[in-house]
Amino acid sequence: SSFYLDTKLLRKWAKENLGGKSVLNTFAYTGSLGVACLAGGSKKVIQLDLHRKFLNVAMRSAKLNGKEVKESDYQTCDFWSRINQYKKSKKMFDCVILDPPVYSKTRKGTIDLANNYEKLINKVRPIINDGGYLITISNALFQRGDDHTSVLDKLCADGYLKIEQRIDVPDDCLGNAATIKQFLPADPSPYNHSTKITVLSVKRKSTAV
């Protein structure tokens, strides 16, 4: 599948809150979150993915939704290298969407949601404008929700990040007593599903209190 129903409410949030904003959608896959931002009136959306074939789907999706497509906004690249380039050029965004795979390894770096999600967040924080948003998504099925929350709470302790909202997976993705055959391997609470979606606000050091 290339379209994830469990992020339906996040797409709704993006459409309602990111109008006029610049957005970086990392690990974009087929770009549904970025297209939702465009549908909500975001002024600029850059979609990053390691694989061109997925970004081609993202471009087609944007066109089907009546949006102008600039190929330069769909960037086939390694996450680690591209974020370094953005930092060096001082390129900033009003919102960064961080939706990494559970595990991935390239020559430039390793993604392991169970062990280094904090590293991923700290990687993108410097390219987010003051007053902007960081949207984090973790699909680590075997990670408890309170363990994930502990990681975020630790990052928020200095006052530069703040948890604004946890976004639920819609009820129609949760199943019911007649369809659930096996319980989740780890308790996702305070989230309602193993897909753990969080909206954080960002303060720059010059303005944080």
Question: Where on the chain are the PLM-derived regions?
Answer:
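C-terminal catalytic and target-recognition region of SAM-dependent MTase-like enzymes
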Residues: 133-209
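S-adenosyl-L-methionine
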Residues: 53-97
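SAM-dependent Rossmann-like transferase core, predominantly class I methyltransferases
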Residues: 1-21
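Conserved SAM-binding loop of SAM-dependent methyltransferases across substrates and taxa
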Residues: 30-43
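Conserved SAM-binding motif I beta-strand of class I
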Residues: 44-49
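Conserved class I S-adenosyl-L-methionine
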Residues: 19-29
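A generic alpha-to-beta junction signature in SAM-dependent methyltransferases
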Residues: 18, 66, 127-129
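S-adenosylmethionine
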Residues: 79-82, 86-157
